[in-house]
A protein has these predicted regions:
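Function-dense linear segments that define catalytic or interfacial modules
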Residues: 147-254, 346
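Short, contiguous acidic/charged loop-to-helix segments that flank catalytic cores in large enzymes
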Residues: 108, 133-139, 171, 188, ...
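Catalytic palm subdomain of template-directed nucleic-acid polymerases
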Residues: 22-44, 273, 366, 371, ...
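Solvent-exposed, low-complexity, repeat-rich "mucin-like" stalks and linkers
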Residues: 267, 271-309
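Polymerase palm active-site segment centered on the conserved acidic dipeptide of motif C
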Residues: 2-4, 26, 39-66, 384-397, ...
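Conserved "right-hand" nucleotidyltransferase catalytic core of DNA-directed polymerases
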Residues: 1-174, 183-185, 192-195, 205, ...
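Append "Rare intracellular matches occur via the same short Y/T/C beta-strand/loop motifs
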Residues: 299, 303, 326-343
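Conserved catalytic core of nucleic-acid polymerases
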Residues: 25, 146, 229-275, 344-468, ...
C-alpha cells in the first residue's frame, strides 16, 4: 500500500498534465471492427425497441415527450385513491405542474419494477451508444487510435474532448478499447467511493469511518444507519394523572391526548422484516411524568407484521439527560433490536444521489425534491447532524462570506473559485473544490507512484500507464509477463501499487479488473444501468 504523507508528498499537477497529454498523443486504441459491430447492434436494438413501444404501450415515438407523458399520466390515473402512486410521486412535480421522463425518474421506476421505464432507458441507451460508437469510429485515425485533447478544470480534474471520453459510459468504453500493442492485456484499477471518502476523511467524520470499511458497501451502510428501525416515546410533562406508561385504551378514555401521540407508526423504510415477514406497523409509547423525574420506559414494544401477527421486540431508548429537567413535553427515540433490514437498489441509488448533493451544499428543500422514494428530510437531518460535516459546511460558508475566492485541498493546493452567480452558488463551489481538487492531487501522486514502483520492482519492461479516467487508472501489461504471471498475482501487484492511505485516513479501497479484449458481443435486454462511476 502507498502511504502518503500530506505534509511531505506534494502533488505535481504539471507532471500529471504532461504525462496524460503524452498518452493521448500516442493515442487510445479502438477495436474498430468491434466498435462498428456494436454500433450496428445498438442501431438494430433501437429500432426493435421502438417497435415494441408502439405494440406494448401505444407510443409510436419514444423520442416524443408528449407521448411519453400521456402514457405515464394515463397509467397514474388508473391507480386507486389511497394506493401509493409511484408514477405520480416520481414523475410529477406538484409545484410546477410538470411531468418528467428524465433518466433519474425512469431509473427509480425501473428499480421498482416498471418495465416501461426500463424499456425507455434501454431505448435511450441504445441510441446514445450507437451515436457514441459512431463518434469513436469517426475520430479514430488509420491505425484505430483516437487522440483526445486534454484540459484541466478549475479543480485540476482532467477533461477530454474530440472525442469526449468522459461522457462515454464506462462499460461501453472498456468494451471497445484495446491494448496499444497486440497481445497485451489491459487492467482497470478503480478507486472506490473516492469523493465521499475524501469528504469523510477530510472532515474527520468518525461516525462514518465504519461505513467506509463495511463489507455491505458505503451507501448501504449509511442508509441502514439513517433509516435504522426505531420507535418513539412521547413524555407528557405534568399532563397525565400518574407518572407511568399509559396504554392506548387508557389514553382513548381520557380523551385529552391527541391520537397522533399514541398511534402506531410505519417503519422508516420498506424492507424491514422479522423472521422473513415484513413489518407493517410499530407500537409507540406515551408516558406521563413530572418535571425533573426520569420516565421508566418498557424494554420491549410490539410490532405488527404483514400477516397481522404481533410480536415483541427489544428496544433501547436514547438518554433523556438533556430533556427531563425541562417543563416542556419531549420525545425519545427507541432503537429496535431483532429487525432485519434490506436496502433496495432504488433506495440505495436515491440515498447516494441525495448524499452527494448534500456534500456540495444542497438545501433541505433540494434534498426533499430529489427524494421520491425515501424520506429526504430524514436524509438531510442525518447527514447535517454529523458534527464534523456540520462544522465543515459552517466553516466553508463563513469562509466564503468573508470574501475569500481561493481554497486549498488536503495537500494545500490552492484553487480559485472563479465567477459565481450568487453567494449560495459560491458556497456550493467552495464545498466542492477541496473534494475534487484533492482527487486530482491524488491522481497526480499515483501517476508518480506508478513510475517509481515499476522501476523499483523491475517491472518497467512489463507494464505501462495506458489511460486515466476519473478515479481510475488503466494499465497495459505486456503479453510475455501475462504468460508467466498468474492473473491474481498481477491483481495483487496493481493493488499494492495503487491502493493508498493518506496520513491516518481510512485506507482507500481499489478494485482491479481485467478488461475484455475479445470480439464477442453478449448484451441482454435491461442493459441500461445508472452511471457506473
Amino acid at each position: 500500500m502507498y502511504k502518503i504523507n500530506s505534509k511531505v508528498d506534494k502533488p505535481d499537477i504539471g507532471n500529471m498534465s504532461i504525462t496524460i497529454d503524452k498518452m493521448m498523443r500516442r493515442g487510445v486504441r479502438i477495436n474498430i471492427s468491434k466498435c462498428q459491430n456494436l454500433r450496428d447492434y445498438y442501431l438494430n436494438l433501437m429500432n426493435v425497441l421502438k417497435e415494441d413501444f408502439d405494440t406494448k404501450y401505444g407510443v409510436s415515438n419514444p423520442n416524443s415527450t408528449n407521448q411519453l407523458v400521456y402514457y405515464l399520466s394515463s397509467k397514474a390515473d388508473e391507480v386507486s385513491l389511497g394506493v401509493k402512486n409511484d408514477i405520480l410521486n416520481i414523475c410529477y412535480d406538484d409545484e410546477t405542474g410538470k411531468w418528467t421522463t428524465n433518466k433519474e425518474a425512469m431509473h427509480k421506476l425501473s428499480d421498482l419494477g416498471y418495465t416501461f421505464a426500463q424499456d425507455l432507458l434501454d431505448y435511450r441507451a441504445a441510441k446514445k451508444y450507437a451515436e457514441t460508437l459512431n463518434m469513436l469510429c469517426e475520430f479514430s485515425d488509420e491505425n484505430g487510435l483516437v487522440h483526445p485533447r486534454i484540459t484541466l478544470g478549475k479543480t485540476n480534474r482532467v477533461n477530454y474532448s474530440d472525442p469526449a471520453l468522459m461522457t462515454i459510459p464506462k462499460t461501453l468504453l472498456w468494451d471497445v478499447i484495446t491494448s496499444y500493442e497486440d497481445g497485451n492485456t489491459l487492467y482497470s484499477v478503480d478507486i472506490k467511493n473516492q469523493e465521499p471518502s475524501i469528504l469523510i476523511n477530510l472532515t474527520g467524520a468518525k461516525e462514518l469511518y465504519y461505513a467506509l470499511e463495511s463489507p455491505d458497501g458505503l451507501y448501504e451502510t449509511m442508509f441502514k444507519q439513517c433509516f435504522s428501525p426505531t420507535t418513539k416515546a412521547t413524555i407528557l410533562v405534568d399532563t397525565l394523572p400518574e407518572n407511568r406508561v399509559y396504554s392506548i385504551e387508557e389514553l382513548r378514555k381520557l380523551g385529552t391526548v391527541s391520537p397522533a401521540t399514541y398511534s402506531a407508526i410505519r417503519p422508516n423504510c420498506e424492507n424491514m422484516t422479522i423472521n422473513g415477514k415484513k413489518i407493517d406497523a410499530i407500537e409507540v409509547v406515551c408516558a406521563g411524568s413530572e418535571k425533573g423525574l426520569r420516565p421508566v420506559l418498557p424494554d420491549t414494544v410490539k410490532v405488527i407484521l404483514e400477516d397481522s401477527e404481533v410480536c415483541d421486540v427489544p428496544v433501547t431508548w436514547e438518554s433523556c439527560d438533556k430533556k427531563y429537567k425541562k417543563n416542556a413535553d419531549y420525545e425519545l427515540v427507541g432503537h429496535l433490536g431483532g429487525v432485519d433490514m434490506t436496502v433496495s437498489k432504488a433506495e440505495r441509488n436515491e440515498f447516494k444521489t441525495a448524499y452527494l448533493a448534500l456534500s456540495y451544499g444542497a438545501s433541505k428543500m433540494g434534498i426533499k425534491k430529489i427524494c421520491k422514494i425515501i424520506d429526504g428530510a430524514r436524509v438531510y437531518d442525518y447527514i447535517t447532524k454529523i458534527e464534523a460535516i456540520k462544522k465543515y459546511r459552517s466553516m466553508i460558508t463563513k469562509y466564503s462570506k468573508e470574501g475569500n475566492t481561493c481554497i486549498g485541498t488536503a495537500f494545500g493546493t490552492m484553487l480559485d473559485v472563479g465567477e459565481s452567480y450568487n453567494d449560495r452558488a459560491k458556497v456550493r463551489t467552495m464545498l466542492d473544490l477541496p473534494i475534487q481538487g484533492t482527487g486530482a492531487d491524488i491522481l497526480s501522486l499515483l501517476i508518480k507512484r506508478f513510475e517509481t514502483y515499476i522501476q523499483e520492482h523491475g517491472l518497467a519492461d512489463c507494464m505501462s500507464l495506458y489511460f486515466t479516467r476519473h478515479d481510475e487508472l488503466i494499465i497495459e501489461v505486456k503479453k510475455e509477463y501475462c504468460v508467466k504471471t498468474p492473473e491474481d498475482e498481477i491483481s495483487n501487484i496493481l493493488t499494492d501499487m495503487i491502493a493508498y492511505q493518506i496520513d491516518d485516513w481510512v485506507p482507500a479501497k481499489v478494485e482491479v479488473k481485467k478488461l475484455n479484449n475479445n470480439d464477442s458481443i453478449d448484451i441482454q435486454r435491461g442493459f441500461a444501468s445508472e452511471d457506473e462511476d
